[in-house]
From Swiss-Prot:
This is U-scoloptoxin(11)-Ssd2a. It is found in: Secreted. Residues 1-21 form the signal peptide. Residues 22-32 form a propeptide. The keyword Translocase does not apply.
Length: 232
């Protein structure tokens, strides 16, 4: 999905697990002025403030904050599909600082831009500065934001390089023999799950780490090992 994302500078299979594939980068980033390395940036209008996942690895709820709400408003990190500030897509939930805009409350069409991810980094040091995510519609059941579904642009503003990526919502395909069926990013405090395709009938996608055909260790502001699985 998250070349994660989340939230990486690249965790493996994608940007922010394709727009949410930079989990470790959203947990600790440099703020807009660079004065506090533990801060996360202030939310932009209509951006989601956190990404929640009910984790099939250990049944825990993992939370990836992306920005800080303003005006004394807090970003809820509790799973609640009925609070008016959440969009739920299967085991994922996007949280907003205020009520979800009405323009989002419809199912994505095949041609529609479903999600926009904006990544800011220092153009010299490549240090990740901020991630802003914007939903444009609701991705229906059995669909997701696959890694190959995006296009994007790059611009430079002052000392920052800004990458804008646009994702489409697509129905998950049946895995081929050499496809990654899902990836498990295991960190010191968080575990992120990304499903890439559905295994053929009679096969399953394993969760045992020893079954991974590929592992990748990544250390930036946090430490993650990504385990890529194939259908068995």
């Amino acid at each position: 999905m998250f070349q994660f994302c989340l939230l990486i500078l690249l965790l493996a299979p994608g940007r922010f697990f394709s727009a949410l594939g930079k989990p470790q980068e959203t947990l600790t980033v440099e703020n807009r002025e660079g004065s506090d390395s533990k801060a996360i940036p202030t939310c932009r209008e209509a951006s989601f403030c956190a990404f929640l996942q009910k984790n099939p690895i250990d049944s825990n709820l993992d939370v990836l904050p992306t920005c800080t709400c303003t005006g004394g408003t807090t970003c809820s990190h509790s799973w609640d599909p009925n609070d008016g500030k959440s969009i739920t897509e299967g085991n994922k939930q996007f949280k907003f600082c205020s009520n979800v805009p009405d323009t989002i409350k419809h199912e994505c069409s095949a041609e529609e831009k479903a999600l926009t991810g904006i990544f800011e980094e220092d153009k010299v040091t490549k240090k990740h500065l901020a991630y802003y995510g914007f939903l444009h519609c609701i991705c229906p059941e059995h669909s997701d934001y696959p890694e190959n579904s995006y296009d994007g642009t790059e611009t430079v503003e002052g000392d920052k390089k800004i990458t804008t990526e646009y994702y489409h919502c697509e129905r998950l395909k049946t895995c081929k023999s050499d496809d990654t069926c899902h990836a498990l990013a295991i960190g010191e405090t968080k575990k992120i799950y990304y499903k890439d395709c559905n295994c053929p009938e009679g096969q399953t996608c394993p969760f045992e780490l020893k079954s991974a055909y590929k592992t990748e260790y990544k250390e930036t502001t946090d430490k993650f090992t990504t385990y890529s699985m194939r259908c068995q």
